[in-house]
Each structure stands twice: as structure tokens, then as C-alpha cells.
Design a protein with these regions (language model features):
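Assembly/oligomerization scaffold segments
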Residues: 1-112, 196-212
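Acidic, small/polar-enriched beta strand-loop surface segments
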Residues: 2-17, 176-318
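Extracytoplasmic
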Residues: 8, 27, 38-42, 80, ...
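Amphipathic, non-transmembrane alpha-helical segments in extracytoplasmic/periplasmic proteins
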Residues: 44-45, 102, 115-140, 153-180, ...
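Flexible glycine-/small-residue-rich
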Residues: 47, 102-104, 190-192, 226, ...
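Short intrinsically disordered coil segments
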Residues: 59-63, 115-121, 201-208, 239-241, ...
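Short, conserved beta-turn/loop elements at beta-strand boundaries and strand-helix junctions
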Residues: 88-93, 315-321
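Short beta-strand-centered interaction patches in the first periplasmic/extracellular domains
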Residues: 95-109, 141-216
Length: 329
């Protein structure tokens, strides 16, 4: 029987005619991943190339077919993934199986470019809803918002525009966010706000822990520049230093427009130093799979090397092997 430590998974593909093809315990692999640097969730698995009504399955299933993944932990089937077949790989030398790669709706935002202009004074949620309405998706917004200056988003991926807006909020508030699609709705949440906090513990479900510490991406000094003068030069109006004596100078620059005070610009600079002013530690965790855990969740880890609460940066569920790989901070 399915349980939280022995979950069951099944995939479902709906072809162009509306016929449903279910795969439970028949696929030879099934991975569901949420990478750190992308908002699109990815699914990949091998499909048995069985014969259905005289046709091979590889000739029935095509790209853009609807793709769903469900899990059961003992309380019935729940949806884990909703998206599309994006890639189909077949191999003439081995016709027994073929490979499916699917993505949720965010893949369209990552592969489509657009331009937007927003006048000064627009709130974060207003900007994001404008983008969402134009592209036909809904947003559930559970994150902080600010009043933005004039914003020009020119010829870039829709997902990059969304992230650019949210990065401005993070710089000014210091709060981290997570973005993901669930049932075709885009969720924007503050990280670590999940109501159920699952644990990874030694001798229970933890399998392997490793830690990486790096200075890559650090900032120890922030230069604040004002608006350009008639010669195109941008004057330095302030400099905020972090721990340059220990780590050396790793400099970032931010711009202060005429509507932003130096005090507020310094506040933004201090938020950058708070987030990036010391070496980054990333912990990689391999544990028995828990399909409920997703990117942005808070998890409790208790092992010899780690103890406390951590935020999930990325996660891969290997349903076939019943393990999950997480990167946490």
C-alpha cells in the first residue's frame, strides 16, 4: 500500500483525439524536477511502446499532448504535474520503449519573448497581472509588493520579465520568493511558507548529505550611481561596503533614479550585502522520496552534519528508484 515513505506514481497522456493513456508501474523511469534557475517543472520517463488498436504507441502520442503525473501517499491520487509532451525520442534500433520529456505551462513563458512598458507608480501585483492577462494565465500572489519606478521590459522572455520584477521586490524587502505552476496557475509565494514541514532524518529517510561552500556570486561592495548627466556619465552618489577585509572587493552597482532617495538606495545596497556578502553554502541531500515536497518549501533536516530548517532550492523526484535529490540552503 502507498505511504509517505513508499509513494506510488502514475503518468497520464491525453492524445489529440482525447483518448487517455495511463502508465502506472509500466514505465521504466520517471523523474519530476524543479531546477533552481528555471520556473518550468520538467518530467521525463520511458514509455513502453505497446500496440494499441493496431498502432504502436510511439505513433499515437505526439508533442503538445497533455501530460499529467499523479502521486498517492495512502490517501488517494493527487496531481503532481500538469503540462505538455514537449519532446518525444524514439530509437529504431530499440523499438521496445521511447522517451517522453514534458514541461508545465511555464515552458511557454521561457520560450516566448515580449515587451512591456509600465509607468512610474505601478504596484508589483498590477504589473504581473498585466503580463498574465496578456498571456492568458492566472496568478496566485502570496508575496510582498512594492511601488515600482518606470519599468521597461524589452524583447525578453516572459519568464525573465517576471523574475526581473520579483528581483526588484527582493532587493528592496530582503524577502525571497519562489515561482511555479500548479494546475496551470502561476503561484508566486514567499519561500518557506508551507504549512506542513517535512523532516529528513538520519537512520529514517536521509541517505546522503554533501556541502559546497563558494565565493561565486558574492558581493562585498555596492556602488550607487545617479542619473546620467549631459555627457552620459553616471556619478557615484554613495558606496556601501561589506566585509572587504576578509573576502576582498567583489563589486556590484545599482542605479538611483531621481525619485529614489540616497537613504533608500543604501537600504537596497545593504539588502544585497545581507544576501550576498558572505560565502554561499549549498547542501545536497539525497533521501527517500516524498512527492509532497517542492521547490521553495521549508524542510527540517537532522543528520550528523546538518541540523535545523532549510529552504529547498531545487528538487528532483526519482519515482522509479523512490529517492529524491534536493539542494537546500
Amino acid at each position: 500500500m502507498a505511504s509517505i515513505t513508499n509513494p506510488a506514481y502514475k503518468a497520464l497522456i491525453v492524445d489529440n483525439a482525447g483518448t487517455k493513456y495511463g502508465f502506472e508501474k509500466t514505465q521504466t523511469s520517471l523523474d519530476i524536477s524543479q531546477p533552481e534557475k528555471e520556473i518550468a517543472q520538467k518530467v521525463q520517463f520511458m514509455v513502453p511502446n505497446i500496440t494499441v488498436s493496431g498502432k504502436k504507441l510511439k505513433d499515437i502520442i505526439s508533442v503538445k499532448n497533455r501530460l499529467y503525473v499523479y502521486y498517492d501517499i495512502g490517501s488517494g491520487w493527487k496531481e503532481k504535474f500538469r503540462g505538455y509532451v514537449w519532446t518525444k525520442n524514439t530509437n529504431e534500433s530499440d523499438d521496445r520503449t521511447f522517451r517522453i520529456v514534458g514541461y508545465d505551462r511555464a515552458i511557454y513563458l521561457q520560450n516566448s519573448k515580449d515587451s512591456f512598458y509600465f509607468a512610474k507608480g505601478k504596484k508589483t501585483k498590477t504589473i504581473l497581472n498585466t503580463i498574465a492577462n496578456k498571456w492568458g494565465f492566472k496568478i496566485v500572489f502570496n508575496y510582498s509588493q512594492i511601488t515600482h519606478p518606470k519599468t521597461v521590459l524589452r524583447s525578453q522572455a516572459i519568464s525573465d520579465s517576471i523574475i526581473e520584477i520579483l528581483e526588484e521586490v527582493k532587493k528592496k524587502t530582503g524577502k525571497k520568493y519562489v515561482v511555479y505552476f500548479e494546475k496551470d496557475v502561476l503561484y508566486i509565494n514567499t519561500v518557506g511558507t508551507n504549512t506542513t514541514i517535512y523532516s529528513v532524518k538520519k537512520r529514517e529517510n536521509a541517505l546522503k548529505i554533501s556541502t559546497e561552500e563558494t565565493m561565486e556570486g558574492m558581493v562585498t561592495k555596492v556602488v550607487i550611481r545617479g542619473s546620467a548627466n549631459d555627457n552620459g556619465k553616471t556619478p557615484v552618489v554613495a558606496t556601501v561596503k561589506g566585509n572587504t577585509s576578509t573576502y576582498g572587493t567583489l563589486q556590484d552597482e545599482i542605479s538611483k533614479d531621481k525619485d529614489t532617495s540616497v537613504a533608500n538606495a543604501k537600504k537596497e545596497a545593504n539588502e544585497i550585502l545581507k544576501e550576498k556578502g558572505k560565502p554561499f553554502k549549498t547542501r545536497s541531500v539525497t533521501a527517500i522520496d516524498n512527492p509532497v515536497i517542492k521547490k521553495g518549501d521549508k524542510v527540517n533536516i537532522q543528520t550528523d552534519d546538518l541540523s535545523g530548517s532549510f529552504i529547498v532550492l531545487s528538487i528532483n523526484h526519482d519515482a522509479y528508484q523512490n529517492i529524491m535529490d534536493l539542494e537546500v540552503e
